[in-house]
Regions:
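Alpha-helical transmembrane segments within multi-pass membrane transporters and channels
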Residues: 101-142, 285-289
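Cytosolic-side transmembrane-helix boundaries in multi-pass membrane proteins
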Residues: 1-37, 189, 209, 216, ...
């Protein structure tokens, strides 16, 4: 008679992570359906396919930017330079596209992405090399970008043109689906591959859990940090380019409205604000949820101050809700 093969114990932290991620995605998906059904009471058009596709299109702008923010938060850091990375990129792109040099104008989008990469590089070096806390460094960079933009434009609306490719990406459709949403799906697939299938993804999660342990294991933690901030800067710039195409302009404070929603989308999606845990699926659904909520608040003519209060309250409520499965799992393992 043979004895049964022993089963390997599952680490309680792993159970808690899977439970929390599944709980967050389920809760957010339920919330999305509830918002659509509740919004239909106020505005019947909420249930139409055209409205849902429009919301997915708008969610794409937030989702692309939130992708970069999630990577930084997985490190256990936070990027507060998002608002003026977005605005600065929009100003650069429209000014270059509106130049009278056709060759230079054709480089508007690549140079816009390079702007985001440069800002991300500055942020990464400040955090990884100079050891300044990310919250302080990126906030200072954001203030410098604001000052540079106001100095360059004189405080007036930036002049220039919008690249046709930005307009096509933001407003065009392919097989009935918004191009912006299709682009977001592609970026999401690449992000999932990076997080699940590459050594970079494993290092990213490990750094969020214990940067010192990863350093002692021989990993190049400074390089990982810098690369992550560069990716976040590029994605913020890509979001800015899409926004420029959608609004057909660049304007002062273009990215100001995105800082809180970006953080909210990542956090309510189940990514730990302390780093080391979270999935992109949660961030994806979180961006859709925030977009639907913003749409309903706009229909209700809610003032911007009230929207910010609601965003903050939702973040706190979701964080408290996520403690329930983690506490329950911890209790069963005692």
């Amino acid at each position: 008679m043979t004895s049964p093969a022993p089963t390997l114990p599952v680490h309680p932290r792993r159970i808690g992570l899977l439970d929390r991620v599944g709980f967050s995605v389920t809760l957010l998906a339920t919330g999305c359906f509830a918002l659509i059904l509740g919004g239909a009471i106020v505005y019947p058009g909420f249930l139409t396919p055209a409205y849902i596709l429009q919301q997915l299109q708008i969610a794409s702008f937030l989702g692309v930017i939130a992708t970069g923010a999630m990577l930084v938060i997985l490190l256990g850091e936070i990027d507060l330079s998002v608002p003026w990375t977005v605005t600065g990129t929009a100003i650069v792109v429209t000014n270059i596209a509106g130049s009278h040099n056709p060759m230079l104008a054709s480089l508007a989008i690549p140079l816009g992405l390079a702007t985001g990469a440069t800002i991300g590089l500055v942020n990464g070096l400040g955090v990884a090399v100079f050891r300044v806390p990310a919250m302080v460094w990126t906030l200072a960079v954001n203030a410098m970008l604001l000052g540079a933009a106001v100095f360059y434009t004189g405080g007036f609306k930036p002049q220039g043109a919008v690249p046709w490719l930005a307009t096509y990406a933001a407003l065009g459709h392919t097989l009935g689906a918004p191009n912006a949403f299709m682009l977001w799906l592609i970026i999401g697939a690449i992000t999932l591959w990076l997080l699940r299938r590459t050594i970079y993804g494993r290092y990213l999660y490990a750094m969020g859990n214990s940067q010192r342990a990863l350093f002692l294991a021989g990993a190049r933690v400074r390089t990982i940090t810098v690369c992550t901030f560069v990716l976040a800067g590029i994605l913020s710039s890509l979001g800015a380019i899409l926004l420029t195409g959608y609004t057909n302009q660049a304007y002062q404070g273009m990215g100001d409205a995105y800082l809180m929603p970006v953080i909210a989308a990542v956090v309510i999606g189940g990514t730990s604000i302390q780093g080391g845990s979270g999935t992109y699926l949660g961030t994806f659904v979180g961006a859709v949820f925030i977009t639907l909520l913003s749409s309903i608040l706009a229909v209700m003519q809610m003032p911007d101050a009230a929207r910010q209060i609601i965003f903050g309250a939702i973040i706190l409520a979701m964080l408290l809700a996520y403690r329930w499965p983690a506490t329950r799992v911890a209790g069963t393992n005692q």
